[in-house]
Each structure stands twice: as C-alpha cells, then as structure tokens.
Amino acid sequence: MVWRMPAETAPHERIWMAFPVEGVTLGDTAALREEGYAAWTAVATAVAARTPVAILVDPTEVARARRMLPGEVEIVEAPVDEYWMRDHGPTFVVDDETGRLGAVDWIFNGWGAPEWAQWQKSAGHARLIADAVGAEIVPSLLVNEGGGIHVDGEGTVLLTETVQLDPRRNRYADRARVEAAVSYTHLTLPTNREV
C-alpha cells in the first residue's frame, strides 16, 4: 500500500478543530481569554459555512462550546489540553489504488517538550479522530507537528528542519533518518523520489 498526502488545497470532507481550554495560553486576563474563545468560535463558524466542522471539546468546556458554537459545528467530547489541531492531529493520507483513507499518527511532544506545554491528552487525538472517521492508522516513529510539513500532493514534501531535526523532538535524527521516516509514512508518491 502506498499512501499519498493530498495537497492542502484538495477537496476534503471535514475540518477538525479543538476547542480552547481555560488556563492554557489564552491570555492572562478574563478579557483576553474571552477574545481567544471568540476567535476560535469565529473561525469554526466561518469554516462551517462552507465545510463541515467537528471540534474536540474537553468535558470542562462543553457548556461553553455549546453556548458559543453554532449548531452545525459537531461537538465531539474528548480530553483536550493542547488545541492547535494542525500540529497534534492526524495527517490524512489516501491510497489512490483502493481509495482507502489513512491517518498518520505522528508522535507529538508539545513542540519539543518545553516546561510550559501540556500535550499528553491531545497527543492521542490522531487515533481518536482516525477511529471516528474509519481511517487506517499509519504509525510513525517521528516526533513531528503537522505544521512542520507541506506537500503538493504530487510527490513533493517540504520539511521544517527546526522541527524534524530538533534534538528535543528527534534526539538521534539526521537528514537520512528523517527522510526514511517520511518515506515509511509514505507522504511522497512514489516513495523513491528525492525529499
């Protein structure tokens, strides 16, 4: 099976988000925190006008999410500590021969395990979402964030050295190991093209 990550501009069925959690990088004042919640709500609302949205919401935030989000946004209750879904969520891939959907489960450690970050709950979101949509889980040995990779859907992948080669993320990584890990998760098609 060969997986291909479609370009970000390719049609897709749904946008996955995570709702903010009180006390996690939303601001030092009540006013700033409310602005943060309002911004997340505005994004979810704008996207939902064109594309279905599902949003993971921590049990402690369900009442607020139901009050703030429009009814067309699907609320999925799940433990959340980090809410930058692009970084800790799955990377969806497709097997073009069978049409099967896969979800790469990168290892997420809160951007290199800084003292301030809380990510243990959200590190499991890739598998939770894969299960919810019936995608095959594509495991990875690479500590990565989804925002650290970009593809064109035709075999080109751009990586961010400050992510993949960061010793706080991938202690023993060098270019060859990162390229092998990316080839293992089959982000390029065919996998023998230069990365």
What spans do the regions from the language model cover?
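Cofactor- and metal-binding active-site motifs of prokaryotic enzymes
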Residues: 14-28, 32-41, 54-150, 155
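Hydrophobic alpha-helical segments and helix pairs
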Residues: 159-160, 179
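Conserved small/polar residues in nucleotide/adenosyl-binding loops
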Residues: 185-191
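A short secondary-structure junction signal
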Residues: 115-116, 160-163, 167-173
